Amino acid sequence: MFIAMADFKLLLLILILLSLFELDLLHFHHDFFSPFPVKIGLLLISIFFYAYSTTRSKPVYLVDFSCHQPTDSCKISSETFFNMAKGAQLYTEETIQFMTRILNRSGLGDDTYSPRCMLTSPPTPSMYEARHESELVIFGALNSLFKKTGIEPREVGIFIVNCSLFNPNPSLSSMIVNRYKLKTDVKTYNLSGISVDLATNLLKANPNTYAVIVSTENMTLSMYRGNDRSMLVPNCLFRVGGAAVMLSNRSQDRVRSKYELTHIVRTHKGSSDKHYTCAEQKEDSKGIVGVALSKELTVVAGDTLKTNLTALGPLVLPLSEKLRFILFLVKSKLFRLKVSPYVPDFKLCFKHFCIHAGGRALLDAVEKGLGLSEFDLEPSRMTLHRFGNTSSSSLWYELAYVEAKCRVKRGDRVWQLAFGSGFKCNSIVWRALRTIPANESLVGNPWGDSVHKYPVHVT
């Protein structure tokens, strides 16, 4: 286990002070200032600062991140999607009309991406094609990340992969170990949910370490091939994408890192049956597997978000907003007055908003519920339009959009808000450590070739 440079200096100071017990270096006439009491006092002070430095929480830095951009040959327009659906000879005419209405109102553009096997007529999904999709996305994001940071794969001590619907054997993390020939003691994890919290806790237990998070989803084997309407919406919204994020707890990385993690708030409402079953992978009446979305999904998401914000608010809101909340409680609870629901003004504490691009209806609900502006939701809506719903990696496409627009300034706070089945809601707050200049903002950025076209009006 390595010793951080700051801890090493403190340890060295203690050793020097201990040596003073053998060397009579201090000479004072007053008994109070005799060498022995002075040495004891200095030693106790040093021990205190050493204990403080080793027990306090170490900062977690976001060195950089990278999002995968598939090739143009994988682009799928609305017309291509409908031709694919008809060519598959799996869907009834009513189902195709239903998916047409969903896609036309989805907020997706014509430049999103699909697995190559889904663009053939008929589609040819297989385990081989599913692995091919994951390899393209994961290795594409990782290669870009290692190039941007200059960090070698073998320098990374922790790898975490989160992918909900594709869990092959060997695992996706083992695929990374094999591809980059990682060390035998590397720590690897495969998750089906959001993973920044796990990475942060692992970094607390492993000093002087890099941790890489890979967020992706697999579309090849996830496409629903039946006619149950509750399972057809994911077909219309989900697209190929993935991101890789480099985190560090090394103090020397602060200078070059983009962001510092300030807060993580996780909310899990799985104890409620309504929340637990609102997004569920299961078989339809004919035994065809798909992800069924409840009509109450937006309501469930709003309820989970409310619980999450109750915990997040006290951590980030200014004193003025906290006083407003206390006043609201006094009026509504103590005096039983009919008052409008209290909605915190999160624009007072966050400069940039990266809301999970799960769908147009979800973004509309969050925008209205939190009183956000079109500008605040621009990164999320444009990500949905350009890349579709790429699951948890959409948060990173959104942050990449903000950087591509040269909006990130030193000291800005970024709020990433994610939703997941279960039902879960996670808030992640970052503070920008430096201004991202124009000559850096487009390097390895998936928006590099298209950001000048955005924002666009989405009907």
Curated annotation (Swiss-Prot):
Subcellular localization: Membrane
Residue numbers annotated as active site: H268, H352, H356, H385, N389
Expression across tissues: Expressed in siliques.
Catalytic function, reaction form: a very-long-chain acyl-CoA + malonyl-CoA + H(+) = a very-long-chain 3-oxoacyl-CoA + CO2 + CoA
Record's bilayer topology term: Single-pass membrane protein
EC number(s) on file: 2.3.1.199
Gene Ontology CC terms, in alphabetical order: membrane
Listed GO MF terms: fatty acid elongase activity
Family label: Belongs to the thiolase-like superfamily. Chalcone/stilbene synthases family.
Name the UniProt record assigns to this protein: Probable 3-ketoacyl-CoA synthase 14
